[in-house]
Design a protein with these regions (language model features):
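Gram-positive cell-envelope targeting signals
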Residues: 1-30, 36-37
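Acidic, metal/ion-coordinating pockets
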Residues: 24-263
């Protein structure tokens, strides 16, 4: 797996095997698409068949720092059992799809950073990022309320850890594109409500994805009330905005269980 970087922004491009051909990931800011993606957009699609995308919802690779040495906690369990352990029972499912998406909550860093004052702050070692590709996960959403648990420095470390592990990501500033044989799927994300500024930014991202040739845009929405069966008015509003801006599919989390669908 290889990573490429664009000059003006972090632009990860991870090569992976897909049916004997190569699929690629691109991560970039809306106003700075990588040249390689623009070249790929000129290809005539020869793809036939289906693309299978799995959405796993909230995922934390670590936990509260005070529990880092707990034998039963995530950190010590992963160190003891191996980095392939967390997704072991999902391996057959995730290895059989084309794209697996998680909402990555928490920070991946090896530095001692000041935590933001809040109820829960999640973090794990930087090399925990490799848990994702070992488990068949190619894409991480970072639009949530835990990516800044250790401030901007922790967030930057998380992005770097994912890039080093060959995992693509999307957030408020970056979109992700999966490209294979002329087919392109774009991914965007949001957390909770969409302010006027956030709406403007999201529209620019979706416009950019269409301009580079994405035939499908997926929006990942982190919003709602945990353990409630029905979507909240906030979720419905954000989903409607995303569709109006160009999303073909909106996937919500983190209610912790399945909710209603609207087709």
């Amino acid at each position: 797996m290889r990573i490429r970087y664009a000059a003006a922004c972090l632009a990860a491009c991870a090569a992976l095997s897909l049916g004997g051909a190569r699929a690629e990931w691109y991560v970039f800011e809306a106003d700075n698409p990588p040249e390689a993606l623009l070249d790929a957009a000129m290809q005539v699609s020869g793809f036939t068949g289906e693309v299978t995308v799995s959405f796993l919802g909230d995922c934390t690779l670590g936990g509260e720092s005070k529990a880092a040495n707990s034998r039963g906690g995530f950190v010590q369990t992963a160190l003891r059992e191996g980095y392939d352990y967390p997704f072991l029972n999902l391996q057959s499912l995730l290895d059989g799809d084309d794209v697996t998406v998680v909402n990555l909550e928490g920070v991946l860093t090896d530095r001692t950073l000041d935590r933001v004052k809040k109820t829960f702050n999640f973090k794990g070692p930087a090399d925990f990022a490799t848990i994702l590709p070992l488990g068949g996960v190619e894409l991480a959403g970072l639009s949530n309320n835990h990516t800044l648990d250790y401030g901007a420095e922790g967030y930057a470390d998380t992005q770097a850890a994912l890039a080093d592990a060959g995992v693509a990501y999307f957030d408020a500033d970056h979109v992700a594109v999966w490209a294979h044989d002329g087919v392109m799927i774009g991914f965007t994300g949001s957390a909770f409500s969409l302010s006027t500024g956030a709406q403007k930014n999201l529209r620019a991202q979706m416009d950019a994805l269409r301009e580079v040739g994405c035939q499908l845009i997926v929006h990942s929405m982190h919003a709602g009330t945990e353990y409630e069966r029905e979507p909240t008015s906030q979720q419905k509003t954000v989903a409607a905005h995303a569709v109006d801006m160009g999303a073909d599919l909106v996937v919500g989390h983190p209610p912790m269980w399945c909710r209603a669908t609207n087709c």
